[in-house]
Swiss-Prot record:
CC cofactor note: Binds 2 nickel ions per subunit.
Entry EC number(s): 3.5.1.5
UniProt keyword Cytoplasm, yes or no: yes
Reactions accelerated catalytically: urea + 2 H2O + H(+) = hydrogencarbonate + 2 NH4(+)
Binding-site residues, substrate: 219
Family: Belongs to the metallo-dependent hydrolases superfamily. Urease alpha subunit family.
Signal peptide: none
Subunit structure and binding partners: Heterohexamer of 3 UreA (alpha) and 3 UreB (beta) subunits.
SUPFAM superfamilies: Composite domain of metallo-dependent hydrolases (SSF51338), Metallo-dependent hydrolases (SSF51556)
Identification of the protein by name: Urease subunit beta
All residue ranges annotated as the Urease domain in the record: 129-566
Catalytic residues (positions): 320 (proton donor)
Cofactor: Ni cation
Length: 566
């Protein structure tokens, strides 16, 4: 029996070779492979196949806790269609689900039984939960904003709206680190806290790693001197944790070459590598071409629009405790906001030279816009630069995989947590996001945290069905009680991980970061460009390997007003 492609897609979602648009962008995804079996698809509902003795085995007991059926998976590993099995909060298997007594080709681990729940994803997209590595923990209100955007892991530093936290992503000292870990214990996300890395004292930094910091942050407002950089990286090497850096905008303790020299070819994660958010003016962006640097961007400059420059000056004055009445403060602010380097930042993302996107939450960046702005850049670059190498006029899979890697697998690798999160792969935590294709990147439908639904777009709770308006994000059972702790984790250093849970009396599991010191740009998935980046100190013109970068601001972006009328 044959049915039309249109009818098949309406019942089971698109299949191999079918194409679809991401939200209202010009990005077109093409399904590379379909792991389901035509005519044997698992589908739940009245008169459908997932019933006892049909696609549900009447005898199976040890089965997946949840199976997501017929999902379109968009991941750095590929764009494909499959069923996803989840057990004990982790991805158990990806492939074809069903009853092996009746159907050949059932993937091991995807047998459906009486102990299996079903989430129907026909025609919908599944991605890994986003990872934001640049969080200023200023306000707890950021948590729900991030979660409702599709972010499931938040990494950074801070202690609330203290002046230091407003400007820098550091949680300084054992007591502050302990209190922050305890404070997020009932929140349905993974967290990691970075200690203050600005010290010439090895011991002062060691104490923070032993207290539970997952890494260290160097920030110019605390003094990112070559000696502080060297000391911080020495501690990181000894304890296998990552160092993030916001370099010296004013070039007080040396120019960018002095900072790179202090790295001594050791691995480091550079924040807002373009420089509008901070860093050696005007040429910090050079570091994005180095083999030992893991470069990231923050979202306020992404993508470059006609309003970017004007918005940034006021933001910068507030975030860094500057005064418009002090000429030196105004000069400091103006030195960081450069249209040509901001324009070049988008191109560096498209080339894979900048590997990671993040927010810089409430400190010049927007915590709920990491994902949306990443895709806006991808759209803008397709409009300006055309088809990416390896793609064709009918699909943009290579570009799509490059950009999704920027907020999933690459931040995970940079922070040493890719064994646990960052992609849709067997064995990893089931931190997954379900999207309607028309709302992809803008408004997720369901956020699954550790295999359990934590947040969802939900209608009136007094209605007779789940869908009546008002539809809004509401916390689900995965966010309540002890479930939130059981389905999420705290990332810490190895040295702190063994006894931290009992020491602090927390319910979240504690996992150690790993393999942060033996990696480099070559490990950044689909974003591993290494080359010579030059910035003219007078004109701010940018060249890559001697070739000038050309890019303009855009006047309109997708994924914007039409999605936020209500």
């Amino acid at each position: 029996m044959k049915i039309s492609k249109e009818k098949y897609a309406s019942m089971y979602g698109p299949t191999t070779g079918d194409r679809f648009r991401l939200a209202d962008t010009t990005l077109i995804a093409k399904i590379e492979k379909d792991y389901t079996i035509y005519g044997e698809e698992s589908k739940f509902g009245g008169g459908k196949t997932v019933r006892d003795g049909m696609a549900q085995s009447p005898t199976a007991v040890d089965v997946a806790d949840l199976i997501i059926t017929n999902a379109i998976i968009i991941d750095y590993t590929g764009i494909y269609k499959a069923d996803i099995g989840i057990k004990d909060g982790k991805i158990l298997a990806i492939g074809k689900s069903g009853n092996p007594n009746l159907c050949d080709g059932i993937t091991e681990g995807l047998e459906i039984g009486a102990n299996t729940e079903i989430l129907s994803a026909e025609g919908k997209i599944i991605t890994a939960g986003g990872i934001d590595t640049h969080i200023h923990f200023i306000s707890p209100g950021q948590i729900n904003e991030a979660l409702s955007s599709g972010v499931t892991t938040m990494i950074g530093g801070g202690t609330g709206p203290n002046t230091g936290t407003n400007a820098t992503t550091c949680t300084p000292g054992e007591w502050n680190i302990s209190k922050m870990i305890q404070s997020v214990d009932d929140l349905p996300l993974n967290f990691g806290f970075m200690g203050k890395g600005n010290s010439s004292s090895y011991e002062a930094l060691k104490v923070q790693i032993e207290a539970g910091a997952m890494g260290l942050k160097l920030h110019e407002d605390w003094g990112s001197t070559p000696n502080a950089i060297d000391t911080c990286l020495s501690v990181a090497d000894d304890f296998d944790v990552q160092v993030a850096i916001h370099t010296d905008t004013l070039n007080e303790s040396g120019f960018v070459e002095a900072t790179v020299g202090a790295f001594k070819n050791r691995t480091i994660h550079t924040f807002h590598s373009e420089g509008a958010g901070g860093g050696h003016a005007p040429d910090i962006m050079k570091v994005a071409g180095l083999s030992n640097v893991l470069p990231s961007s923050t979202n306020p400059t992404l993508p470059y629009t006609k309003n970017t420059i004007e918005e940034h000056l006021d933001m910068l004055m507030v975030c860094h405790h500057l005064s418009p009445k002090i000429p030196e403060d105004v000069s400091f602010a103006e030195s960081r906001i450069r249209g040509k380097t901001i324009a070049a930042e988008d191109v560096l993302h498209d080339l894979g030279a900048i590997s990671i996107t993040s927010s810089d939450s409430q400190a010049m960046g927007r915590v709920g816009e990491v994902i949306i702005r990443t895709w806006q850049v991808a759209h803008s670059m397709k409009q300006q630069r055309g088809t990416l190498e390896g793609d064709d006029e009918k699909s943009d899979n290579n570009r799509i995989k490059r950009y999704i890697a920027k907020y999933t697998i690459n931040p995970a690798i940079a922070c040493g947590i890719d064994e646990y999160v960052g992609s849709v792969e067997v064995g990893k935590m089931a931190d997954l996001v379900l999207w309607n294709r028309a709302f992809f990147g803008v408004k997720p439908e369901i956020i699954i945290k550790g295999g359990f639904i934590a947040l969802a777009m939900m209608g009136d709770s007094n209605a007779s069905i789940p869908t009546p308006e008002p539809n809004m994000y509401r916390l689900m059972f995965g966010s309540l009680g002890r479930a939130s702790g059981a389905t999420s984790v705290i990332f810490t250093s190895k040295v702190a991980s063994s006894n931290l849970k009992d020491k602090l009396g927390i319910s979240k599991n504690v996992l150690p970061v790993k393999n942060t010191r033996n990696i480099g740009k070559a490990n950044m998935k689909l974003n591993d460009f290494i080359g010579d980046i030059e910035i003219d100190s007078e004109t701010y013109d940018v060249k890559i390997n001697g070739e000038p970068i050309e890019s303009n601001y855009v006047e309109k972006v997708p994924m914007a007003r039409r999605y936020f009328m209500f």
